[in-house]
Regions:
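A structural signal for small-residue-enriched, beta-sheet-centric alpha/beta enzyme cores
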Residues: 1-75, 79-89, 99-407
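Generic structural marker for isolated residues within well-ordered, non-membrane alpha-helices
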Residues: 95
Length: 407
């Protein structure tokens, strides 16, 4: 596997465009379009929140009931959530505008929104934005990067990644972009992820690959414990790499899954590290677990703990907060067998052995916790299973950003 520069336009046949439609933000781009020269098999995973935004419902219809997709249109600023039938009609109107402009099937157009809940979209601006983007579609890396910028809300940086692998003697490329900074606790940010690939693969296996991978990537991220109404990951495969079709779980499928995991893990960590007001990526590894489920429950409990996140911001080795978060997680373990370590590029230090603090250097611990990426490793000594969750520290700026979000 080779990591390359790029995002959604890295794979063959994919183009992107962006525009400033003035939907809510002024003086910046706020709409993005991704287009494939050929129809794609599509896969998707969506929020588990009972309150689902209109675009989520629209995309579920397209992904699950139609054979192909070819376009993604995304706006930032307004979420189109809790907007009733009118909100759903705006999804249809957006798809219709894209279909007419690009000469594709209306049922091949996926739509996504992120922003403030409860506001209706200005449909004229949305339609005008679609028409403005279509002639600007390009397959350049710059076009993909600009699209990644257009879907940002409180994000501080665009998020994209791409890789190349070889399948059946052909070069296969996978690229992706995402946005997410606050309201991140997906269980399928607002968390939106768009991944494109030129691999030739069956629709069923594409969906299986994505559904399985999301469990270990995006679903292991928590910035603030809030599960958005709009969480969506879409994966399009147009087959233009011309590899032999992957239609069984063979070596080629595993190779594709490994590359997809790299894409999604990288994007998930970028979301966690760019949490609203964050100064550090906080990673929690549970090792020695009896089951995967136990490890997942424990790691997510720690990474979601506000007190632990505040301690990470203060570079404070307050291990009691970690043990406490593990204790109320609902997972069973023996606290008197837990070993705990902190690790960063500044080094690694043991804090607890068999549930009791060791004689460690507070100065050394603070040094390790002062880096931009910090890992807590808890060994519960019950088995061989592991899980890793990602989050960020909790800062004063998180409250400031969210107190002013609608203004």
């Amino acid at each position: 596997m080779k990591v390359i520069t790029g995002g959604v336009t890295a794979a063959k046949g994919f183009q992107a465009a962006s525009t400033a439609a003035g939907i809510k933000y002024q003086g910046r781009t706020d709409m993005a379009m991704v287009y494939s020269e050929k129809p794609c098999v599509a896969a998707g995973t969506f929020t588990t929140n009972i309150v689902k935004a209109a675009p989520v419902k629209w995309n579920q219809e397209i992904v699950y009931k139609h054979p192909s997709a070819q376009v993604i249109v995304c706006n930032s600023g307004i979420a189109n959530a809790c907007t009733g039938e009118e909100g759903f009609s705006y999804c249809r109107a957006t798809a219709k505008a894209a279909a007419e402009t690009l000469n594709v099937d209306e049922n091949s157009v996926l739509v996504a929104s992120t922003g403030v809940i409860g506001m209706q979209l200005p449909i004229e601006k949305l339609s005008d934005g679609v028409k403005a983007m279509a002639p600007k579609l390009k397959g350049t890396l710059e076009a993909g990067n600009e699209a990644a910028k257009a879907i940002m809300t409180t994000d501080t940086v665009e998020k994209e990644v791409a890789v190349e692998i070889e399948i059946g003697g052909k070069t296969v490329t996978i690229g992706g972009m995402c946005k997410g900074s606050g309201m991140i606790h997906p269980n399928m940010c607002t968390m939106l992820g768009f991944v494109t690939t030129d691999v030739c693969i069956s629709k069923q296996l594409l969906q299986e690959a994505l559904s399985q991978d999301v469990k270990d990537t995006y679903n292991m991220v928590s910035v603030d414990g809030d599960t958005s109404t709009n969480d969506t990951v879409l994966l399009l495969a147009n087959g233009m790499a011309e590899n032999p079709e992957i239609n069984e779980k063979n070596e080629d499928y595993q190779k594709f899954c490994e590359a997809l995991n790299y894409i999604n893990t990288t994007l998930a960590k970028k979301i966690a590290g760019d949490g609203e007001g964050a100064t550090a990526l906080f990673e929690v590894k549970i090792i020695g677990a009896e089951s995967k489920e136990q490890a997942v429950t424990l790691s997510k409990s720690v990474v979601t703990s506000s007190l632990t996140k505040a301690a990470i911001y203060g570079h404070d080795a307050n291990w009691g907060r970690i043990l406490c978060a593990m204790g109320y997680s609902g997972a069973q373990f023996d606290p008197e067998k837990v070993d705990l370590y902190f690790e960063s590029k500044a080094g690694k230090i043991q804090i607890i052995e068999n549930g009791v603090a060791v004689d460690y250097s507070e100065e050394e611990a603070t040094k390790i916790l002062s880096e931009e990426a910090v890992t807590a490793i808890a060994d519960i000594k019950m088995g061989d299973c592991t899980a890793t969750a990602w989050g960020c520290d909790l800062t004063y700026d998180y409250v400031k950003i969210n107190a002013d979000y609608r203004s």
